[in-house]
């Protein structure tokens, strides 16, 4: 089956569905790491990526943003000059009621009978002005870190802004 478009899951329409003990099975998390870079050093500058609207960010989008950001930071700043942290965790389980399509689908399909849906992935529920990613670095690399955060924000389903703190 084809993955549904992200706009179906973007809005916070229903309450959080995260009690996994009642679910048959939930697909694994795509986000591999939540902390990257130099974890031992204390950096003076913090740069945050803040979501401007309430939304749900799918774990696949978070992983795409993480890969993009980490790659840009590794190339421009270097492994030892930053600490990247993902601050939102995808707890919410997304469900999908599979529909048969194509020739003869009406004979195979059950319609809306048992339409609760099966778990297809997870998402992080983000509030307005919540910080999703944070990069700590030195003052000389602030522009490169801002650029990396901004470009990874294009992968997320909400408008974002970059905030610099000393």
Curated annotation (Swiss-Prot):
One of its GO terms (biological process) is translation. GO terms for molecular function: structural constituent of ribosome. It comes from the Archaea. The keyword Hydrolase does not apply. GO terms for cellular component: ribonucleoprotein complex; ribosome. Belongs to the universal ribosomal protein uL16 family. This is Large ribosomal subunit protein uL16. It comes from Methanocorpusculum labreanum (strain ATCC 43576 / DSM 4855 / Z). The gene is rpl10e.
């Amino acid at each position: 089956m084809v993955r549904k478009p992200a706009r179906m899951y973007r809005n916070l329409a229903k309450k959080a569905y995260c009690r996994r003990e009642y679910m048959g099975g939930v697909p694994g998390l795509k986000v591999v790491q939540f902390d990257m870079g130099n974890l031992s050093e204390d950096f003076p500058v913090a740069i945050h990526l803040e979501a401007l609207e309430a939304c749900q960010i799918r774990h696949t989008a978070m992983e795409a943003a993480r890969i993009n950001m980490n790659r840009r930071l590794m190339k421009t700043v270097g492994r030892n000059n930053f600490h990247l942290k993902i601050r939102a965790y995808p707890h919410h389980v997304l469900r999908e009621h599979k529909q048969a399509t194509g020739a003869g689908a009406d004979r195979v399909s059950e319609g809306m009978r048992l339409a609760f849906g099966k778990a297809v992935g997870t998402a992080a529920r983000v509030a307005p002005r919540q910080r999703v990613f944070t990069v700590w670095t030195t003052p000389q690399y602030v522009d490169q870190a801002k650029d990396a955060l901004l470009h990874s924000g294009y992968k997320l389903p909400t408008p974002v802004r970059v905030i610099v703190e000393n």
